[in-house]
Amino acid sequence: YPLRRQRQMCIRDSNKLMDELAKDKKRIVVLNKSDLADKVELTKWEDYYKNRGDVCVLTNANKSENISKLVNEIRKQGKEIYEKKYSSKNIKVKPIYRCLIAGIPNVGKSTIINKIANRNAAVTSNKPGVTRKNQWIRVGSDIELLDTPGILMPRLDENNAGVKLALTGNVKLEVVDNEELACSGINLLINEGYKKLLVDSYSIEEELLDELDSYDILEVIGRKRGCLVSGGNVDMSRAANVLLDDIKNGKIGNIVLEKVEM
């Protein structure tokens, strides 16, 4: 049965693909990197999945938060499958709970596997595209986890999905223009109700955010952070990288860029 791992800051992008993948299967939805998420919006997502009938576990794999809870859920769901399959046949078998780990790139799938296995069984990195092939990993005597490369929908043009994935580090920044992405990020933060994070993080007057366009706001951010070249001009590419790093690593504050549709 699949364990679906998606970052809270951009959740919906591969839902259709995951739903098809997990069709007629037991599913545990793991919302990893929960420490980076807007707690109010994260709770809405947790309720959304629970209302759909999915088991939902919030984790912060880097700090091993709720990993034991996740393992307990794997065994609980697996036991239900085995009892349903074998109890009526009066067959006694030693259960092996096999889980497919699926999700978009760079959401911590391999890190969670390593925490569950309590060893470095899967290669990890804070950038997408590191896991290249499927790999079965044994945990104890009763759990087998299949680590898989990240999955993305073929089309990412709906609801700024591609921009959101790039902002949260789920696609490689090398394939996008960093200044354009940073400007899109500024617009998203403002439109999604996170204007105050820009004010607090970069000491920008709120009135300026209303008056300036995103490129000019990025220039202000660059000046505030000392991204200057000779002549006192702002190095816009460097300013963009500062903002993108702050968003990706949660330095700007806790955010969710994909909201639950009520």
Where are these regions (language model features)?
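Canonical P-loop GTPase G-domain recognition
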Residues: A37-A102
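Helix-rich effector regions associated with P-loop NTPase G domains
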Residues: R12-I28, S34, V40, D54-V55, ...
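Alpha-helical scaffold elements adjacent to nucleotide-binding pockets in ATP/GTP-utilizing enzyme cores
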Residues: Q6, Y48, K69-E73, K115, ...
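Conserved active-site beta-strand-loop modules that form the wall/rim of enzyme catalytic pockets
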Residues: A61, I113, I143-L146
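Single conserved hydrophobic/aromatic residue that forms the stacking wall/gate
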Residues: Y1-I11
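Short coil/loop residues immediately preceding or within conserved phosphate-binding loops
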Residues: K94-I96, R119, N134
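Glycine-rich phosphate-binding P-loop
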Residues: R98-N118, T148
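Active-site phosphate-binding and catalytic loops of NTP-dependent enzymes
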Residues: R12, E80-S88, A122-N126
